[in-house]
Swiss-Prot record:
Pfam families: UPF0270. This is UPF0270 protein PA3463. Belongs to the UPF0270 family. HAMAP family: UPF0270.
Length: 76
C-alpha cells in the first residue's frame, strides 16, 4: 500500500526518512551528514521519484524508487 508522504505529520515523515537513510546498506560509505541525506530523500518524494510503501504483513514502511515499485501497487 502506498502512503502519500504529504499526508504524514512532519515529525513522522522526518523520523521515517531518518530511519531509512541510517539503515545498514543505505550509506555505502557515504560521509554525507544525516540532515543532507534526509533532505535528499524528502526531495525525491516531492519530485515523485520515490514513494513510501507500507507492507501490512510485516508492519514496515519502505522508501522505494517509484521505478522499482510493482505496477499493480501504483494503480491502487
Amino acid at each position: 500500500m502506498l502512503i502519500p508522504h504529504d499526508l504524514l505529520e512532519a515529525d513522522t515523515l522526518n523520523n521515517l526518512l531518518e530511519d531509512f537513510v541510517t539503515r545498514e546498506g543505505t550509506d555505502n560509505g557515504d560521509e554525507t551528514p544525516l540532515d543532507v541525506r534526509v533532505e535528499r530523500a524528502r526531495h525525491a518524494l516531492r519530485r515523485g521519484e520515490a514513494v513510501i510503501l507500507f507492507d501490512p504483513e510485516s508492519q514496515q514502511c519502505q522508501l522505494m524508487l517509484r521505478s522499482e515499485v510493482p505496477a499493480e501497487l501504483l494503480r491502487d
